[in-house]
Amino acid sequence: MERHVRLFLNKLSFASIAIASLILLLLFLQTPQTCIPPNSPPKPHLKFPKSSCDSTPRQILSVDKKNKRLWSTKHWQNNLSSFLNFFHALRDLGLLHNHTKVLCVSAGAGHEVMALSQMGVLDVTGVELVDSPPLVTRADPHNLPFFDHAFDLAFSAHLAEALFPSRFVSEMERTVRPFGSCVVVVEECGDDEVREIVGLFTKSRFVNSVNVTLTGLKMTRILMKRVSSR
C-alpha cells in the first residue's frame, strides 16, 4: 500500500514539475507587454493601460505656453484690471511715470508687474520667495539683493504676510531713493492699525491712507515718502 502511495506521489511530483516547466517556457517565449513595438496594431477594446507602454505620455508644456494659458484666464484678467486701476490712481498723484524704477515686493504670480508694464513703466522688478518667470524673480523680501536707493518706488500688497514686518519694511525703505515712495496695501483697517504700520517705517514720513478695493477685497493703501538718506 505504501509503495502505491509513493508511486502516486512521485507521478504527481513529475506532473507538477512538467507543468511548471511548461509555464516558465511559455512566459520566457512570450513578448513582455512593456516591449510591444510602437507599430503594433491598436487595441481599442482596452480602456485602461496595462503597462507603461500602453499609457498615453503626458504632454510637457513650456513656460511660455503655461504662462499664456494662465494669463488668459478670467481670474488673471480680473486681478490685472484691478491692479491697473490701482496704479492709475498712483499715476494721477504724480508717483508713477514711464521712467519710474519700481520694485514690487512679494509680487506673487506677478499681476502688479504686468499691470505696471502695460501702463508703460519701463523698469519694473518683481520679487518673491518663489519665482514666476518672466514676471517675478526669486528673492527674500527680508533680505533684498539690491543696492541702497536703487528704486524710485517700492510697492507691496503682502506686508501682512511677512514673517518679520519691521525687517520687511526696512528693506523696502533701504532700496528706495530719498524722496521716493513706499506704498503698502493691507486689509482695510482703522486709524490705530494705520499708525502701527506707519511706525514700522523709520526713514519715511506718512503722507496719507486711503481705503481702496484691490482684487475684489476691501483694502487700505498707505503712502509713505522717503526722507532720510541713511
Regions found by a protein language model. Give the residues of each.
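Class I SAM-dependent methyltransferase SAM/SAH-binding core
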Residues: 99-144
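Short, aromatic/basic amphipathic alpha-helical patches
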Residues: 112-120, 194-204
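A short acidic, Gly/Pro-enriched loop at the edge of an enzyme's catalytic core
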Residues: 137-154, 167
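Short catalytic micro-motifs in class I SAM-dependent methyltransferases
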Residues: 155-159
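A short glycine-rich, Lys/Arg-flanked "PGG" loop and its adjoining helix->strand segment in the class I
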Residues: 164-182
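Core SAM-dependent methyltransferase catalytic element
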Residues: 199-230
